[in-house]
Every structure is written in C-alpha cells, then in structure tokens.
Amino acid sequence: MTFQQNEPSAVPAQSSLSFTQGFLLGQLSVVLLIGAFIKFFIFGEAPPPPSRGLSHRASTHRRSNSIYTINPNEGTSRSLREKPSTSNVLRPVPSSATNTRSILRKTYYSAIPTNPSGKHGRHRIHHSSHQPESLDWFNVLIAQTIAQYRQTAYLLKDDPTSSILSSLTAALNNPEKKPSFIDKIAVTDISLGEEFPIFSNCRIIAVDDPNSDGGRLQALLDVDLSDDNLSIAVETSLLLNYPKPCSAILPVALSISIVRFSGTLCISLVPASTPPLHTPSPSPSPPTADGAVNAGIHPTNGSREPTQEAPNAQEESPPKTSPKSNVAFSFLPDYRLDLSVRSLIGSRSRLQDVPKVAQLVEARVHSWFEERVVEPRVQVVGLPDLWPRMGRTGVRTGEDSETGSNAASRSAMSADMGNSLRADDIGREPDGLRFRGLGARPPFDSVSRTSSFNVETGGFRSHSMTREGSGGGMSDDFHMPGTLPGGAAAN
C-alpha cells in the first residue's frame, strides 16, 4: 500500500521538467530566428547595383567577334615580325561597324521592326519597340540657344551691316526675285518671340536606304510652339506700270504672326561617303564651300596664283577638302502651321483684313516652308569640328587665375598663334556660334581669357558681320545673326 501511494507523486515532477525544457528550447529557437533575421535582413549589406562596365558587358551581353579578336596570336606575331607600311597603320573598320543592327545592339536600343509600314514615299520605316524618351534636358539647351540668338540680334540692332533689320530688308528687296510691280519693301516691326519650342516623344526608327548598309537610323521628335508673338510687319506699294511706269500706286501694309506650329522633326546623319541628296527644288542651289573649290575658286597665297577658268582649275588642282559628315533634318508632311495675317490696303479709303490677301500670304508661306524642310526635301547642315584647338579655347569668368608660368607660356603661344592666324585666317568666317559684342574685340590672348568668356568655333572675323557678294538670290543676301551654320545657304 505504501508503494502504490508514492508512485503517482513522481509523474508530475517528470512532466514539469520536460515542459520546462521544451519551453526554453522554443524560446531559444525564436530568439535565434529573430537574431538571424535582424542580422541578415536588416543590418545586412545590400547587393551591389548591376555594373555597366566593360567586365559586366562582356559577361551579360554576347558580342560578335571583331576582326581584331579573331586570332590575337597571329596579329601579335605579324606586328612583331612584319614592319607595317604607311597605308596599313590605321586598322581597317569592319563592315558591320556601320550596320544599323550592329549599332543598336551595341548601344542596347531595342528597335525591332514590329510594324513595317510603307508610308512616306519609297522608304520603309521599322518602328521601334523602345519606349519614347523625354527631352526635358534638350528643351533646356534649345531654350538657352534661342535666348542667346535673340539677345545677339538685339545687341546688333544698330549695326548697319549685321542687324536683322538690314538683313531682312536686303532679302525682301532682292531685285532678281522681287516683281517689278512691287515697290520697295520696308520692315516696320519685328518680334522674335518670348516662348520656346517644346520637344517630346523622341524615338529611333530604322529606315531602308539603298545608299547605306543595313539602312539608316532616324530620330523622330514631336515639336510644338504655341502662344508666342513671333511676327513681322512690312509696308510696300503695288505699282501699276501701264500705260506708263508708276501710273498708279496702292499702299499695302501686312503683318504676319505665327499662332502655332506643331509637327514631327526627323533627324538623321549623312555619312561623308554618301553622295549628296537629290533635291527636286527647281531653284538652283547656292554656292557652297565645296562647290567653290570645285568651280575653281581657291584661296590666294604667296605660292599659288588665282585661277582664271573653272575647267582648267579642276584639271590642274583637284579639290583637297576632306569629306565632311552632315546632319539632315526635315518635317513630316502632317505638320501644322497656323498663321495670323492682318492687312491694310489703300491710302484714304482703306480695306482692313481682306480674306483673299490672307489666303494668298498663307499659301505662299506654306509653299516656301514645304519647298525647303518638308519630306522628301531635307536641310543638310555640316557637323562642326569638335577637335580641341587653342584658337577657340576660353576661360569662364570667375575661375581661378592662371599661374605665372602658365600665363607666360600661354601668352607667348597665343601671340605666335595670333600672328599666324591674322595672316592666314583673317577673312575666314566661323563655322558656328560666336559671342560678339557691339564694338571691336581685342586679340584673343591671356588677358581676354581671364576677363571674359569667349567661345569661338571657327576662324577670326571682324567685329561686324559681313555678307559676301553673290548671285543675288534670297539665300545669298539673307543672313540672320545667330543662325545655325548652313541655315542661310539652305534657303
């Protein structure tokens, strides 16, 4: 009986001990899990971002072997054993380097032809599957450039040869293009506007081009300009020359304003080896630098005499100008150009805002625009020379001054360079934008470097803009201050 009474009392002690061990083990496992979570998920280091270096590109993107990596041992042995000639110093460019698909693959731009179309003439456009890109940064740069053009045009408003007023007056009164029944045209008001064009929805497409291997790439940008006061006002008179000259005179005043312009801008590169684009415009093309060389117009120096006849000049001295890459831009035919034309006809009893006059002016402006920059016609502008040169090196205002040794060496170099440039390039026009003042500017030396910010993209020129005499076309006489290079020649 004693054994039976003591046996049930030992069971609760063993069960309580196992419960305590299990409870402690569970608490310990929970603490370990919480500690591991805090260590590895909260205080752990984040994985490094994917690198776009050369090693990452080589591991993630499979690239086709070029001619330089086909057999490196063979190339090394050949370069050590054989002495390369002068013509073999520059390694050949692979044929696939300029291919459209190769360029898109190496730049990681997906331009898969998902929707081939036969629009826009003979070219077949391959639309890209890449998402359209924003152009906010590009809008800021374009706005700064246009603002600088407007400021430059205003600073030169009193210059008799370089002002926009004199340029427009000379262009409108060109005797070879102005009809005889129109009297002298006087510009009474010019407004260059205050707003800026907004570019958006940029996309790259592939266009079939028989002149290039694999087609060519073309950038499409949507542009919109609205709510601006870009306008010009002129006054003239209509002359009745029958039965005798100036039998009757009818005064006419016109004002043309751009209300809104929107369209799609197409930009593409024209390689130097590509033949010039065919322009079906009936008007003869204006003379260019290359055309002047081909026509026998050569710079006069001490060792060469000016040529007299164009055929002999072509046979004796072929053109030595290197080929130059160009940028071609145009607008698609679905553009929108809204104009506001106001007219005032007569001297005593005047007719105001005649609808027929507005229709004629709008039709003429649209025709002028379509003959120059609407597909299939394009404007071709040469790319500027971006090689760093001392002749166009400047120092921003407020930067640290130069040390004595650097200033002395640069001043001596600029003096020697200035003498040679003044002897050779004094009559050469710059190829791009140059910030000019109203008065004459001192030579570009170390003093002017530290006092102001001068940017030059071409040769030296005088303080006033000059127009060279030409055949008398509107494109030859019309030169707007601050325009893009080649813009006047394209007209």
UniProtKB/Swiss-Prot annotation:
InterPro entries reported in the protein's UniProt record: Mmm1, MMM1_dom, SMP_LBD
Localization terms from the record: Endoplasmic reticulum membrane
Biased composition, class Pro residues, residue ranges: 275-287
Cytoplasmic side: 44-491
UniProt keyword Ubl conjugation present: no
UniProt keyword annotations, A-Z: Endoplasmic reticulum, Lipid transport, Lipid-binding, Membrane, Transmembrane, Transmembrane helix, Transport
Superkingdom, taxonomy of origin: Eukaryota
Membrane topology summary: Single-pass type I membrane protein
Biased composition annotated in UniProt, kind: Basic and acidic residues: 422-434
Segments traversing the membrane: 23-43
Residue stretches making up the SMP-LTD domain: 131-384
Molecular functions per Gene Ontology: lipid binding
Stated family: Belongs to the MMM1 family.
Name of the protein: Maintenance of mitochondrial morphology protein 1
Gene name for this UniProt entry: mmm1
